[in-house]
Design a protein with these regions (language model features):
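A binding-site-centric feature that preferentially detects glycan-recognition modules on secreted/surface proteins
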Residues: 2-127, 131-195
Length: 195
């Protein structure tokens, strides 16, 4: 079964899955208090329990190796902001082209990636991190020191066939370009979700 087929799941968690996910998120929250200041688990949990479709998306982030964690709270909207916080680009989302156009270009050449970042993110109900969000993420830890992650590409770059990705090397954040049809075993994507 390819990765895209795996994503065509019912977008609802069983009570057992919901409890397991909440336990995982609570443990991660407690173990990474340095990522956020002034947030309380009880308020976050109440918000999560009221948004079952968002729990499903968080579960998809978790299931594919993203280790989602809350990184901020938008005081204007009241939303909590989650990013994939796995040390390396999520394992269940690697070997993907940037978007469907890139994937189709590869497949015409007889090469079959695991899918594409844009469609996978949409199916999961998340957004790719922007370059700015990626840089914010890197302020709370060292991520992608051995891998890289596609980031949301500006339309003017994408129109010309390119896409951008980022990583951390030599204690610096690098943003690079590549053709959208490219895919690698060490490149995936990181998502963001507002709850």
């Amino acid at each position: 079964m390819n990765t895209m087929t795996m994503y065509k799941l019912k977008k609802e968690l069983s009570p057992e899955q919901r409890e397991e996910l909440l336990r995982t998120l609570k443990a991660r929250f407690k173990n990474n208090m340095n990522r956020y200041k002034g947030l309380e688990w009880a308020k976050l949990q109440a918000k999560l329990e009221a948004k079952t479709e968002k729990l499903w998306s968080l579960n998809e982030m978790e299931r594919t190796g993203g280790e989602p964690d809350v990184v901020d709270h938008d005081k204007k909207t009241g939303e909590y902001i989650f990013y994939d916080c796995s040390a390396e680009s999520p394992k269940g989302r690697r070997n993907v082209c940037y978007d469907r156009e890139g994937q189709e270009a590869r497949e015409k050449k007889g090469v079959h990636p695991e899918g594409n970042a844009i469609d996978m993110a949409a199916t999961m109900g998340v957004e790719l991190l922007t370059e700015e969000q990626y840089r914010e993420l890197q302020k709370i830890g060292n991520f992608d020191t051995k891998t890289s992650s596609w980031v949301k590409t500006p339309s003017d770059i994408r129109k010309l066939g390119g896409a951008i990705f980022a990583d951390r090397r030599y204690d610096h954040i690098f943003v690079y370009h590549n053709s959208a049809p490219s895919f690698y075993g060490v490149r995936g994507f990181r998502g963001s979700l507002r709850v």
